[in-house]
C-alpha cells in the first residue's frame, strides 16, 4: 500500500477534487444502500446494476491499479464496508478513511482520478466493461495467443474430423481418403487435395500449404526441374506427388479427374492458367489453384495445380475456394482465410485465421501482391508482375490514371495495342500473334510471370473487380486514350504489353489485343475498362472490369473482328479474348474478376466456355506446356 501510495503520491499531487470525492462518496453510499437493499425487490434492478458497475470498475481498477484499489477502498470503506469486504485490507479502515483519504489523497487522486473519470462513465454505463474480477482480456492478446493455440486446436479438430470424415467419406472418395489416411494425410475431404470449397476448415489447406511451399512447382521452375525438384520438395509421399504430377491422381481421385490430365481447352474451360470458373475446378485452377486459389491462397503460388491436380473441377478449385473460401486472404495464400486459417500462418494473410483471409482479401489483393494497391502502382512499373501489371494497369489506370503514366508503358501499350487494334485489327492480330509467340515464349520463358500473373491476376482480378468497377474506368479510359494519344512509351508498352500479355498467358492478351483493337471504343472501353490493360488486356480487363462491358466491348471487338463472341472465343479475342485474356491474364483477371467483380460466374462460365477455346488453347499452349509437364495434377 505504502509503496503504492508513495508512488501514487509522487506521481499524482493533484488534490482530488472535492466534488469528485463527494460524488464518489455519494455513489458509494448509494451502492452500499443498494447492497443492503439489493436483496429487497426495491433497489435490485438499477441499483444492482450500478453496484455491479461500480464493483466492476473497482475490480478492474483492482486489477489495473491494485494500490489504487486499496486506496480507493479505504476511501470508500466508510461508505462501502461491504464493498471493502471484498478487499479485506480496507475493511477496517473506515475510521481512517478520512485520514487515509487525505494521507493517501494523492494516491487516491491517482486512483480516484481514474475512477471518477470512469465513474461518471460507469454511472452512465460502465457496462461496457464486463463485470469480472479478472483483468479484462484484451482481444488482441487473445488473438495473439490464438494462432498457436488455434493451430493446435485445429489439429485436434482435424484429427477428429479425420476419423469422422473417414466414416462419412463418400464411397467414391473413400479410396483416396483411405489412401491418404494411410499416409496420415488424414484429409477428411474427398482427397487430401480436395477440400470443400465452401468449408476450408476441414483440413489443412493443402493448396495454401503448397502455395506457401510450392514444392518447386512454380512455373519458372516447372519447365526444367519440375518433376524432380517438386518430388524432392514434396512434403508428402513421392507416390502421391507422382500421381498428381503424372495424373495418376486422375485414376485414383475422381476429383483429379481427366481435367487435371487434360490440358485441353475443353477441360481448360476453366481457363487453366488463369481462368476457370470459381467452381470450374478445371486445371485453370492448377495454375492459380483456380483463380480462386491464387486469389484466395497465396498469390504466391497460385499454381500448385499439381497438388490440386486441379482435380477435375473439384480438385483445385474445390480445394481453393474463391475469395471467401480459403485462407482467402490470409493465405494470401489461400484466398479464403476460410481455407486453412491454420495454414494461413503459411500465408501471411491467414495467420490469424480467416480474417487473415479478409486481410488477404485485402491482402490477397493487396497483401498477396505486395499490397495490391501499391503493387499495382508498382506493377504498373513492374509490369513484369504480369497480372499485376496488366491489372495494375487496368486497376492502376483505374486507380491511378496518373499511375497510368507508369502504366504508360502498359497503358500506352494498351493504347498502342488499342491503337493497333483500333487502327489495325490485323495489326492487333499481329500483335496477338506476336503476343502469342511472345507470350508463349514468355510464358514458357517467364513462366513465373505467367504464374505471377495468375497470382497477381487473381489478386488483380479482385482488384480489378473492385477497382475496375470504379468510375476510374472512364478515367482510365481517358487516361489510356490520352496516353495513347501521347503515345508515351508506346514501344515500352508494346514490350510491356507483350510481356504483360505474355505474362497474362497472353491467350487473353492476344485476344485482348484483338478485342481491344477491334473497337477503339470497345478497345478503349475495354482498355479503359482494362485500364490500359492494353486493349487486348483491355478486353480481358474489360471482361474483368466489366465482364459485361468487356464482353460488350469485346463483343463489339469480336464483331468488329467480324467474329461473334464465338469468333472472340475462337480468336480468344474480344469476349473470348476478354474472357480469354481474362482467362489468361485478363481472364484470370477478367474471368475471375468477372466472377468476383460481376459475381458473374456465368460470365465466367460463359467466358470460360468461350474463353476455354482461346484461353484454353492459348493458355494451354503457353500454360498447357507447363502443365503438361506438371502432369495431370501439376
Swiss-Prot record:
Residues 57-143, 347-634 are annotated as: Disordered. This is Knob-associated histidine-rich protein. The keyword Repeat applies. Glycans are attached at residue 42. Disulfide bonds: none annotated. The keyword Signal applies. KAHRP might mimick human histidine-rich glycoproteins to anchor host thrombospondin or a parasite analog in a binding complex with the endothelial cell receptor. Keywords: Glycoprotein, Malaria, Repeat, Secreted, Signal. Residues 354-375, 396-405, 423-444, 453-493, 509-520 have a biased composition (Basic and acidic residues). Residues 57-87, 108-117, 406-422, 625-634 have a biased composition (Basic residues). It is found in: Secreted.
Amino acid at each position: 500500500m505504502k509503496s503504492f501510495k508513495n508512488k501514487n503520491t509522487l506521481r499524482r499531487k493533484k488534490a482530488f477534487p472535492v466534488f469528485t470525492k463527494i460524488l464518489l462518496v455519494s455513489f458509494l453510499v448509494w451502492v452500499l444502500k443498494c447492497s443492503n437493499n439489493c436483496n429487497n425487490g426495491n433497489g435490485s434492478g438499477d441499483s444492482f446494476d450500478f453496484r455491479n458497475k461500480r464493483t466492476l470498475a473497482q475490480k478492474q481498477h483492482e486489477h489495473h491499479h491494485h494500490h489504487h484499489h486499496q486506496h480507493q477502498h479505504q476511501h470508500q470503506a466508510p461508505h462501502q464496508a461491504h464493498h471493502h469486504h471484498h478487499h479485506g485490507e480496507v475493511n477496517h479502515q473506515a475510521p481512517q478513511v478520512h485520514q487515509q483519504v487525505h494521507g493517501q489523497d494523492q494516491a487516491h487522486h491517482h486512483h480516484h482520478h481514474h475512477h471518477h473519470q470512469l465513474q461518471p462513465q460507469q454511472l452512465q454505463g460502465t457496462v461496457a466493461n464486463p463485470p469480472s474480477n479478472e483483468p479484462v482480456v484484451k482481444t488482441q492478446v487473445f488473438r495473439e495467443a490464438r494462432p498457436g493455440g488455434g493451430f493446435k486446436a485445429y489439429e485436434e479438430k482435424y484429427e477428429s474430423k479425420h476419423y469422422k470424415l473417414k466414416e462419412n467419406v463418400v464411397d467414391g472418395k473413400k479410396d483416396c481418403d483411405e489412401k491418404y489416411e494411410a499416409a496420415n494425410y488424414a484429409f477428411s475431404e474427398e482427397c487430401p487435395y480436395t477440400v470443400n470449397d465452401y468449408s476450408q476448415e476441414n483440413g489443412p489447406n493443402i493448396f495454401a500449404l503448397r502455395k506457401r511451399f510450392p514444392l518447386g512447382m512454380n512455373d519458372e521452375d516447372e519447365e526444367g526441374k519440375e518433376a524432380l525438384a517438386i518430388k524432392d520438395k514434396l512434403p508428402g509421399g513421392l507416390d502421391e506427388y507422382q500421381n498428381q504430377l503424372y495424373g495418376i491422381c486422375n485414376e485414383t481421385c475422381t476429383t483429379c479427374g481427366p481435367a487435371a490430365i487434360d490440358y485441353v481447352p475443353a477441360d481448360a474451360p476453366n481457363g487453366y492458367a488463369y481462368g476457370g470458373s470459381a467452381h470450374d475446378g478445371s486445371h485453370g485452377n492448377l495454375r492459380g489453384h483456380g483463380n480462386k486459389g491464387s486469389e484466395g491462397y497465396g498469390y504466391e503460388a497460385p499454381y500448385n495445380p499439381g497438388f490440386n491436380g486441379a482435380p477435375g473441377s473439384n480438385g483445385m478449385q474445390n480445394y481453393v475456394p474463391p475469395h471467401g473460401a480459403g485462407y482467402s486472404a490470409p493465405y494470401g495464400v489461400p484466398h479464403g482465410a476460410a481455407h486453412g486459417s491454420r495454414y494461413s500462418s503459411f500465408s501471411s494473410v491467414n495467420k490469424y485465421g480467416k480474417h487473415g483471409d479478409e486481410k488477404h482479401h485485402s491482402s490477397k489483393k493487396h497483401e498477396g501482391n505486395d499490397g495490391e494497391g501499391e503493387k499495382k502502382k508498382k506493377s504498373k512499373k513492374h509490369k513484369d508482375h504480369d497480372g499485376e501489371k496488366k491489372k495494375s494497369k487496368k486497376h492502376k489506370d483505374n486507380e491511378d490514371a496518373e499511375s497510368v503514366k507508369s502504366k504508360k508503358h502498359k497503358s500506352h501499350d494498351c493504347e498502342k495495342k488499342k491503337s493497333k487494334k483500333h487502327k489495325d485489327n490485323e495489326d492487333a492480330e499481329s500483335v496477338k500473334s506476336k503476343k502469342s509467340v511472345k507470350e508463349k515464349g514468355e510464358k514458357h520463358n517467364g513462366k513465373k510471370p505467367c504464374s505471377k500473373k495468375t497470382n497477381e491476376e487473381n489478386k488483380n482480378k479482385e482488384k480489378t473487380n473492385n477497382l475496375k468497377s470504379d468510375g476510374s474506368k472512364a478515367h482510365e479510359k481517358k487516361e489510356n486514350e490520352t496516353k495513347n494519344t501521347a503515345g508515351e512509351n508506346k514501344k515500352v508498352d508494346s514490350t510491356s504489353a507483350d510481356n504483360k500479355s505474355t505474362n497474362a498467358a497472353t491467350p487473353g492478351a492476344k485476344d485482348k489485343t484483338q478485342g481491344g483493337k477491334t473497337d477503339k471504343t470497345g478497345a478503349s472501353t475495354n482498355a479503359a475498362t482494362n485500364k490500359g490493360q492494353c486493349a487486348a488486356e483491355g478486353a480481358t480487363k474489360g471482361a474483368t472490369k466489366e465482364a459485361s462491358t468487356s464482353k460488350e466491348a469485346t463483343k463489339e471487338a469480336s464483331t468488329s473482328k467480324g467474329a461473334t463472341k464465338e469468333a472472340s472465343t475462337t480468336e480468344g479475342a474480344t469476349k473470348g479474348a476478354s474472357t480469354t485474356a481474362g482467362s489468361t491474364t485478363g481472364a484470370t483477371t477478367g474471368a475471375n474478376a468477372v466472377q468476383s467483380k460481376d459475381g458473374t460466374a456465368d460470365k465466367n462460365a460463359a467466358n470460360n466456355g468461350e474463353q476455354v477455346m482461346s484461353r484454353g488453347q492459348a493458355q494451354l499452349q503457353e500454360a498447357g506446356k507447363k502443365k503438361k509437364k506438371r502432369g495431370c495434377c501439376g
